[in-house]
Amino acid sequence: MKRLFPLLIFLIPLSVFAQNKDRESAAAEKARKRQEKKEKINQLIKQEEEGALIYQKQHAYNFNFHTDGWSFLFEKGKYKTIKKTSLWWLSFGERKHPKEERVPTVSSTGGLLIVSSYIYGKINNFYSLNLGLGEQRLIGGKGNKNGVAVSFIYGGSVAAGLLRPYYLEVLNPTTGARDEIKYTDATKNQFLDAGNIIGKGSLTKGWNEMTVVPGFQARTALRFDYGRYNEILSAIEVGLHASYYTKPMPMLLDVPEKKFFFNAYVSLSFGKRK
């Protein structure tokens, strides 16, 4: 033990010294990368000031939170000038009626307690599929490496309104079995009898029964890009959608059906430039 003590006295400071060197080396590496990034951005700004396109293409994934639902959008862009980018996009989402109210339910089967919920009076899930073209114009933040670049986006798309029948799980008053039903003239009484409703139907029901209604959609937005000189695209977008369909879109019973829909949205955008 006495022989080990001097060895420990020697090794402990050596270990501390090695750890300090590792930390200093890691800090130096981070500083070097920051400096390289700064120099690259300065070079890109200089190229842009000379009129050169610093990137040719971009793509982004947008997660949109609407005032009446949600959507996911994939977007591709081609830079035309420093300030102008041509865009095309494909989006899919779901629209919900503002009068929808979710009703919780509790039931039992085989000795198990099942907690579920449903929307009373809902007859269709309303999905939207859009293929669009547009343009993105830089309106603020040019040459500002520390700030936010602001762009105006506008365009239009052909739209398909997809109506999927909304299924409920109900207790059959005759057989006592659990049935999954959609709203029809034949099932109207069961569908609206809240006392016999167990919960919503299976997510797999109704996809092969969808009705497609054509339409079109207009899009305007402001995009706040937090790294326009970076290869990684990260932005927040706020905008408006106006959609029109060729037929009324039934969603809830005893609620007027509409062809025209208007909403606002906030979007988180992530992507890449090259």
Language-model features: locations:
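Residues on the lipid-exposed face of transmembrane beta-strands in outer-membrane beta-barrel proteins
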Residues: 63, 72-78, 131-137, 156-160, ...
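Outer-membrane beta-barrel "beta-signal"
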Residues: 26-34, 259-274
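Residues that define the transmembrane beta-barrel architecture of outer-membrane proteins
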Residues: 55-59, 66-70, 84-86, 125-129, ...
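Outer-membrane beta-barrel transmembrane domain signature
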Residues: 153-236, 241-253, 257, 270
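Cleavable N-terminal export/targeting peptides
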Residues: 1-52
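Outer-membrane beta-barrel translocator/channel fold
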Residues: 92-128, 134-145
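Flexible, solvent-exposed coil segments and beta strand-coil junctions
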Residues: 41, 48-55, 106-117, 194-203, ...
